[in-house]
From Swiss-Prot:
Coiled coil: none
Chief localisation class: endoplasmic reticulum
Family designation: Belongs to the MMM1 family.
Keyword Disulfide bond: no
Protein name per the record: Maintenance of mitochondrial morphology protein 1
Location relative to the cell: Endoplasmic reticulum membrane
Annotated PANTHER family: SMP-LTD DOMAIN-CONTAINING PROTEIN, TEX2 PROTEIN-RELATED
KW Membrane (keyword) present: yes
Origin species: Postia placenta (strain ATCC 44394 / Madison 698-R)
Assembly mode: Homodimer. Component of the ER-mitochondria encounter structure (ERMES) or MDM complex, composed of MMM1, MDM10, MDM12 and MDM34. A MMM1 homodimer associates with one molecule of MDM12 on each side in a pairwise head-to-tail manner, and the SMP-LTD domains of MMM1 and MDM12 generate a continuous hydrophobic tunnel for phospholipid trafficking.
């Protein structure tokens, strides 16, 4: 008679080890799913009962004073503060009016809470147009602060030409401190092991503390086929300082507040966007069209002269 396989109800060490691993994994899934994740399928625009806020030490007037302190002071007695450097005060006055015009336009010219609501809806609509639908639930914007000041430019100076045939350019130092902030909530979707397996609710407030950088302004080339004014932020070969505040809340029943890794990720993404998309070309009326300049930019990107945006 051949050897028969005898099944024993007494578990072996290997069976116990495998069963223990599955038990731990099962408990971990339960804890994550029912404490931190949200399993409700109809979650569109569902918000947390708490939206984190940035606690500021300064009010709007205080922020304006901070911006004033951060900006270099103009030279006394009509003297320039450095070799061939100008204060650019006239440009700062123009920049303040330009930004204020955009703020009024975003609010449809409405004051107070009514204008705030118009700006909030516009930012929310733009955010949902840009969000990846398979990764994030619809984004709910709770509040938007468009700020009260403008970047402060100083020390306008010619940029030294590294080669005889390089284009002349003007370099500025820029410093910006304002009340700009954005408060929103959404959910991160988990599509494993099946679609919409779970949702991780996230409430987030992002606020600008201080941003400083150099700015390079390149005038148009008179003999170029499509002359444009080029603005680089930051100036090539230089660094910049970006300080932002974040307040976050993650989870459904059990909540994690102010996760450091989330702050690092947001800061890194903003820095990456500034480096990749920090070049703007201003089309001169009557000398070129936007479509022609876009074709020029594509050719420059293919030739490796510009970063791909």
């Amino acid at each position: 008679m051949g050897n028969a396989y005898i099944f024993s109800l007494q578990p072996t060490f290997t069976q116990g080890l495998i069963l223990g691993q599955f038990s731990i994994l099962f408990l971990l899934v339960l804890v994550l799913k029912y404490l931190f994740f949200d399993t409700v399928s109809d979650h569109a625009y569902r918000t947390s009962s708490y939206q984190p806020k940035i606690e500021r030490d300064e009010d709007e007037d205080g922020i304006a004073l901070v911006a004033e302190r951060l900006a270099p002071k103009p030279a006394q007695d009509g003297k320039q503060s450095g070799n061939e450097c100008e204060s650019a005060d006239w440009l700062n006055a123009l920049l303040i009016q330009v930004l204020e015009a955009y703020r009024v336009k975003l609010r449809d010219g409405l004051p107070g809470a009514e204008g705030d609501e118009v700006a909030r809806k516009r930012v929310e609509r733009f955010a949902n147009q840009m969000r990846p639908p398979g990764f994030l639930d619809p984004i709910k914007v709770h509040s938007v602060d468009l700020g009260v000041t403008a970047p402060r430019l100083s020390r306008a100076r010619p940029r030294p030409q590294k080669a005889p045939n390089t284009d002349p350019a003007i370099e500025f130092d820029m410093s910006y401190a304002d009340t700009i902030s954005l408060s929103l909530s959404t959910s991160v979707l988990f599509n494993y092991p099946f679609a919409s397996f779970a949702r991780l609710p996230v409430s987030l407030t992002i606020s600008l503390s201080h941003f400083s950088s150099s700015v390079l302004l390149t005038p148009p080339q008179p003999h170029a086929q499509h002359p444009t004014v080029t603005l680089n932020l930051p100036s090539p070969g230089t660094d910049f300082v970006l300080n932002i505040q974040t307040k976050s809340l993650m989870g459904s029943r059990a909540k994690l507040a102010d996760v450091p890794k989330l702050h690092e990720m947001i800061t890194h993404q903003i820095q990456r966007v500034l480096l990749e998309k920090g070049t703007w070309k201003v089309v001169l009326p009557g000398l070129a069209s936007v479509s022609e300049v876009k074709e020029d930019v594509k050719r420059e990107q293919q030739a490796g002269e510009l970063p791909v945006n």
